[in-house]
Amino acid sequence: MRLNWFSPLPPAKSGIADYTRQLLHSLTMAADIALWTDQEHWDPALEAYAEVHTYRLQEMPWPEVNRATMSIFHIGNNQRFHGAIWQVSQRHAGLIVLHDLALQQLFAGLFREQWHDRMGYLELMERFYGETGRQDGEDFWAGRLTIEYMAEQYRLTQYAMDPALGVLVHSQRSYDELRHDCPCPLSYAPLPYAIAPPGSRRAEGNGEPNPSGPPYQLIIFGHISENRRLTSVFRALAAFPEQERFRLHVYGELWDHQRLRREVEDLALQDVVTLHGFVPNATLEAALASAHLAINLRFPTMGEASVSQLQIWNHALPSLVTKVGWYASLPTEMVAFVRPEQEIMDIQAHLRAFLSEPWRYAHMGEDGLRYVQTHHTPGAYVQALIDAVKDAEAFRPSAIAHDMARKVGQEMRRWTNRPAGDVASDLWARVGGFRHDHAGGHPSLGGLNYRHLEILKGLREKLSEQVQEMQRQLSKGLQAIQRAAWDECYPPAHVQAGRGNTHSLIHHRRYLTCARPYPA
């Protein structure tokens, strides 16, 4: 099985790039993987496991792409990393892996920041959310609504799933939310995370908490956008009487570095907070290994499971998380919850409790490590992924018919602004010589004529061509299998000569099960 893998690749500053790096070894044990990227640079170490192909949207190498059994598209809400991947998925149906359940940021980034397509964005919002969605889209475009509000109210997940042959999510909660609306097979598999990075407490065989301190080391890391709640953390520390007993280290790209630096200065936290920015993975792993407590808040949440949370547990670190989305489903013995409506108060309460009972928090990290080892193994994830690919492949003929029906419906809608079923019934009545009003149906629709029938006929012929092409491809594959079977049953004479009497018996037995001779 050959799979195309469209994903950010290291050293891209993306947790999904790290996910690909960690999974690649297990993945290549189960399938032939072709990595696809529009990045100019990638970690050469990846090429020890898989071929790396580059692409440009304007010049897609479709013959090479079409060699694979299935294409797997990794979709998240960062337009820089996933915009091109999503665009390829619209032109070449495959399996969508959703790394975020709310994709408003992805599409807002494409339509507003990259394409400057206001009307396209508003039409998209109206298509999925009606007039209210369009009006809020207007307000967002004009700066009257925030992207956080839009992501919470209007996820636009359906837009990414529309052309897919299959969808894979990483949490039971996401699966339950999408199962009734997904237009194709939907699968669920917990995120994989099994590699113990060099320098981690787990790699050293030591799950015990860092014995040093005070000051105790707090850590926040990853792609730091506004929903990571840094301002609330800063304010909680600024008003905490024993702030000198903590040091907060922030690693990762910041959405507004200057603003956050000003907040640190305004709150007089220069001796407590350090903004490190993006650092190499080895530096981050060393920081995690020496930390005492991780802060992994997200509000609003984008809905899916968190690679960074698995990375925290991989270091047996206790963590504070927001009680929303996937995080809310985590066992209470593994994380310390922070309520969105009481953020500052809850953060301070946990800091106070940590100073009083550090070992209670250390046990949370140890329980998290055991949870990762049990529920997030790469082997189980790869098997679930392969099963999802098989389901998607089986769905392919239905997807062609569904796509055709959607195109017909869109065409009919433009004719009369009436449901496609009404239009089809009216045209059928005209062909059969019947009238709707006499048959108890809808009144005959004005403006329809035989030109519209010709359009439908053209669409039908296009579908027929697609089906015939699929049949030709299947036929070629079957012929190749048949030829291979024939060669196995009836090898050339020079091969037979070297096999002696043992071959004669094997050859005789195989002959009984072989298909009829393959024609020359």
State where each predicted segment sits.
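A short, active-site helix/loop in glycosyltransferases that binds the activated sugar's phosphate group
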Residues: 146-186, 195
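A conserved mid-protein helix/loop that constitutes part of the nucleotide-sugar donor-binding site
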Residues: 18, 225-239, 258
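Glycosyltransferase donor-sugar binding loop
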Residues: 247-260
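Conserved donor-binding/catalytic core segment of Leloir-type glycosyltransferases
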Residues: 168, 211-228, 249
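C-terminal amphipathic helix plus adjacent low-complexity
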Residues: 369-491, 505-510
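Acidic donor-binding loop of glycosyltransferase active sites
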Residues: 69, 165, 288-303, 317
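Nucleotide-activated donor-binding/catalytic signature segment of Leloir-type glycosyltransferases, i.e.
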Residues: 260-282
